Amino acid sequence: MAKIMIPASKQPVYKKLGLLLVAVFTVYVFFHGAQYARGSAPSPKYSTVLSSGSGYKYSKVELPKYTGPREKATFVTLVRNRDLYSLAESIKSVEDRFNSKFNYDWVFLNDEEFTDEFKNVTSALVSGTTKYGVIPKEHWSFPEWIDEEKAAQVRKEMGEKRIIYGDSISYRHMCRFESGFFYRHPLMDDYDWYWRVEPDIKLHCDIDYDVFKFMKDNKKKYAFAISIKEYEATIPTLWETTRKFMEAHPELIHENNMLDFVSDDQGLSYNLCHFWSNFEIAALDLWRSPAYSAYFDYLDREGGFFYERWGDAPVHSIGAALFLDRSEIHHFGDIGYYHVPFHSCPIDTSIRLANKCDCDPSKDFTWHSYSCTTKFYNINKLPKPAGWQNHIG
């Protein structure tokens, strides 16, 4: 296995921890994309209160800019205007913990125009350049081959069964867009790497090294913080469709793939494991590749984004597992991360102290029985931190 290059101060030195209680997580209703699935109305136009009144005039304080070498990378967020302030907290966390040191750009995408308020608040928070884009209508609508009456009946039935976001149109558009179109937006053309950020997330630990440079130097193409199992009722035929694609295009499957992460029986069935895509750092050429492009187009034509409720997380995860060399997938175990309802928190005390983490290791989900990260470590023969068994839950 190739040696991972990382600054010496960040190398894990695992020490045995005492027995810790693990919080049992039962809430599954907040899975990926929750913020964008909610109905919303545009925020009112921004009132220029900061430039009026008793002579007070707002001006952005320009902080010293990082002048060292940087990768062609950006943060990217799909967000509605109404989620501005829950996103602002996410941006502040990312800036404080990481980006204030490196000043990477931030791309914001929406299916409608961003308000002046949204642009003013986010540009004041981001240390890099902010860019705002509207999603093309063809990437946020029913494609011509979809039977909309059939799709509406499916939504009705899934809603009656109380399947998460089963009756949502916007959630389906979001999943389809994140699966196959965000990286095609013209604003993404300037970049080779991205870090996806959503509203209401938090980074628990300082990140003092450039994660994009880390990915490039260590030949990684996809990285995650949390893995979990998908809600099976949302993807009943996703794996059947994937198998048909694999049988039709065996030449596109990487010879050193990670099929054993997503299937326990050599591809006969899907074990529901996926990387939680509300946090992902990846090379854009993974999604731009002929292999993934063919896979997404095949899925899209089958209609499962609308006739079922296929999520972008399992689609991305299966794509990464099939089309990458398994060594190109990385787990960021030193990046403490939170998205309702799960925490990723380093259980190694030395890492938490060195990185000024503010998380409770007893709430770490990484090694929980419902997480798939233990499987990721096992199949790749990676060393696990001391005391990980105490966090199985």
From Swiss-Prot:
List where this protein forms a coiled coil.
none
Required co-factor(s) are: Mn(2+)
Give any Gene Ontology cellular component.
Answer: Golgi membrane
Record-listed E.C. numbers? 2.4.1.-
Q: Which residues form the active site?
A: 280 (nucleophile)
Note from the entry: Present with 5480 molecules/cell in log phase SD medium.
Q: What is this protein called?
A: Alpha-1,2 mannosyltransferase KTR1
The uppermost taxa in this organism's lineage are: Eukaryota, Fungi, Dikarya, Ascomycota, Saccharomycotina
